[in-house]
Amino acid sequence: MKLSIAMIVKNEEKNLEKSLKEICKYDFDIVIVDTGSTDKTKEVALKYTKNVFEYKWCNDFAKARNFSISKAKGDYILVIDADEVIESIDINNLKTLINKNNNKVGRILRINQYSRNGERFTYKERVNRLFKKDKFKYSGRIHEQVTEINNKSYDTYNVPIVLNHYGYEKN
């Protein structure tokens, strides 16, 4: 079983390296799709993978995500954003769960980090991010969601992946 990380980015040079350093600790195929960065995002990405592609932004997050998935070599896709950092993955348990649930969508635990009035807060949520490449896709121009390719309903399961999300933090 091969797992690919699919990531879309734009002007993420400040976040991307931290995310990729953690991803590179695992044997994943990494695909990064740049949707029009004007900073050094692409240069940072190329330090970690040769699978960096340009995509002309068309105001549709699902299309960009699906393009990234189309470039992935793995049978399974794990979607991670540039402002998310892997805190933990139980690889052995993950492989077992994927094999048992290959027609379902895996829900990772995302810990959103943010500050307000000098105080730090976190908010935990489960998000659909792990799925079989040939069974699922993204739909929705904004607030894109994982959908079954034939638009059938699907079940989910929790996977042993924890991501810290720093996108709500002020730089």
Regions found by a protein language model. Name each.
Residues 14-18, 39-48, 89:
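Acidic helix N-cap motif at the loop->helix transition within catalytic regions
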Residues 22, 34-44, 57, 81, ...:
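A conserved acidic beta->alpha catalytic loop
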Residues 1-4:
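Extreme N-terminal starter segment of soluble prokaryotic enzymes
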Residues 77:
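Short aromatic/hydrophobic "clamp" motif used to bind/position activated sugar donors
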Residues 42-71:
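Conserved donor nucleotide-binding strand/loop of the catalytic core
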Residues 62-69, 80, 86-171:
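Catalytic-site signature of metal-activated, phosphate-bearing donor transferases
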Residues 7, 28-36, 53, 82:
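Short beta-strand/loop segment that forms part of the nucleotide-sugar
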Residues 6-26:
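Short, well-formed alpha-helical segments that are part of the catalytic scaffolds
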